[in-house]
Each structure stands twice: as structure tokens, then as C-alpha cells.
């Protein structure tokens, strides 16, 4: 019985470490994107530009990123719906299997 608890404990620890690793990878990816964004901004800004031109570039970039965020939110909703549909189908199949097995 204690080995079962140890297995469960180790599995939970492994899952926690996996989540931490994914979270850390996300932070690395996000910071790399910030570096790329700043490099792109430096490419667009020229010494002869006015303040208004620089602000216009930044506003345009902001709008582009907001559109991307919206696209990702929509994609996440679609993925979540697909996961719910799959979970529902698995429950249905499990129930069918239980009913079929119970009749034998």
C-alpha cells in the first residue's frame, strides 16, 4: 500500500515539475518576443523621425499585437470546445461500455 502512495506522490511531483518547466519555457519565449519587439522597433525608428511618427508606429504595432491576442483567444476557445466534446464522447463511450459489460 505504501508503494502505491509513493507512486502517486512521485507522479504528482513529476506533473508539478512538468508544469513548472512549461511555465518557465513560456517565460523564456515571452521575453524573447519582447527582445524581438524592441529590435523591430529600433529598426523602424530613425533619427530624423518626429515624436508623432514614432507614436504612430508604436500604436500600429500595439494594434497588430492586440489582433493577435484576439486570434489566440478565439483559438483557445475553439480548442476548449473540442476538448469538452471529446470528454463528453469519452463519457458516453464509457457509459455504453459499462452497460454492455453489465449485460454479459
Swiss-Prot record:
Keywords, comma-separated and alphabetical: Coiled coil, Cytoplasm
UniProt keyword annotation of Lyase present: no
InterPro entries xref list: DUF496 (IPR007458)
Superkingdom of origin: Bacteria
Gene from which the chain derives: tmaR
Job description of the protein: Pole-localizer protein involved in the regulation of several cellular processes.
Protein name (database record): Pole-localizer protein TmaR
Signal peptide span: none
Locations listed in the record: Cytoplasm
